């Protein structure tokens, strides 16, 4: 098992590096200052490394995660918000069923939310050597969301893997 990221050793210099990277990408000093509040969270690393669902076969995963309710409710939401999904597909190229599938799997259509500080979670995951290329950009993006006003610091709550649970109006 990998041991990188198992301790906070080196986390503060890493945060200093991320602050420089955020500044280079145009993030405001106000949003960058949020990084001064984050701490290494060993519980995040433990959860990340303990995801047993990724060792399941597809059939086992399907039985656990796909239900008639999710399929029908997903179809209903695609119809209900058709104009919004059409606009998203036109602008970003992502079809409605893909978005709705993630919505279902990640939050059961918003029914479940987390209460983790997602910036702290993303910083911890970005520090871990296993997938920094995934989490460093997400950490910067979360600071950018603060900058443009799509989120407030109080709203940057969600699941341990950094998913932000803001209920957006669609």
Feature map (PLM): residue ranges:
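Catalytic glycan-binding domains that act on GlcNAc-containing polysaccharides
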Residues: 27-170
């Amino acid at each position: 098992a990998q041991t990188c990221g198992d301790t906070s050793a080196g986390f503060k210099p890493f945060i200093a590096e991320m602050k420089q990277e955020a500044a280079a990408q145009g993030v405001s000093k106000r949003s960058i200052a949020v990084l001064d509040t984050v701490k290494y969270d060993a519980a995040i690393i433990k959860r990340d490394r303990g995801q047993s669902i990724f060792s399941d076969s597809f059939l086992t995963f399907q039985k656990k995660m796909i239900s008639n309710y999710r399929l029908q409710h997903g179809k209903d939401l695609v119809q209900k918000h058709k104009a919004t999904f059409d606009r998203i597909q036109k602008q970003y190229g992502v079809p409605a069923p893909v978005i709705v599938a993630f919505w279902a799997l990640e939050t059961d259509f918003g029914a479940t939310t987390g209460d983790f500080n997602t910036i702290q979670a993303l910083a911890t995951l970005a520090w871990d050597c296993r997938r920094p290329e995934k989490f460093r950009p997400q950490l910067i993006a979360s600071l950018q969301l603060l900058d443009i006003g799509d989120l407030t610091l109080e709203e940057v709550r969600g699941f341990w893997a950094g998913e932000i649970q803001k209920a957006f109006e669609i």
